[in-house]
């Protein structure tokens, strides 16, 4: 993770020059995760800053309350439980390119640290045995996605969702949801040419994500428990922590990094982190990385 301290003269607007924006993009594509220390107390300026890198935003889960009268700024998941490593919404077509976290309050005791794992490094460390398995066998997720507005009807209706990997798509009127299977590989193309990243939703327990009804491999292949535990242990071996300070902003390449959270102590009731999800960035994918 690279730390960036913005010029204090920019604090009243956070408007970057073309060169300053280019420098941020170059660092982002190289490191994949950036920290902007003590960026601002203004939630409006915060969103304006993020908007300089965003073409569109992802529709975050309804379970996360809206913050600061901005539907794009949401709470992180509630509760004190540990959240295991994952790439945000990597189980569906709604996977954002960039995930942002902003610290409103780091909390009273420092518990609940955000953690991150570089999928490029994890993929590099996996043996050919595992690489061959994941390159040959895509994951199939069985999903039920809530629909924000009430839909009327009694039966399921066949539905068309125009995205590669979607099949068996139905509107479920009784559940007020969209149900479908989604086929996705565990590895992603990265912003660095010819480099792959292991970034997915394989390492979390299913009960932690209500939208996932089932998860397996398309051709019924399975990973045995020993191999699964090895990959999980390897991921956490290279996992690092973020020590939050008030007004810090983190920018994460969601197609490269997996993130999670340590358990929050029950007495730590003041921890307050919010998230914004850039669905599509407004700069070219891999636009600053050299072809090597």
Model regions and ranges:
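Active-site environment of non-heme Fe oxygenases that use a 2-His-1-carboxylate facial triad
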Residues: 1-16, 21-23, 68-72, 79-85, ...
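Cytochrome P450 catalytic domain signature, combining two hallmark sequence patches
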Residues: 54-62, 131-133
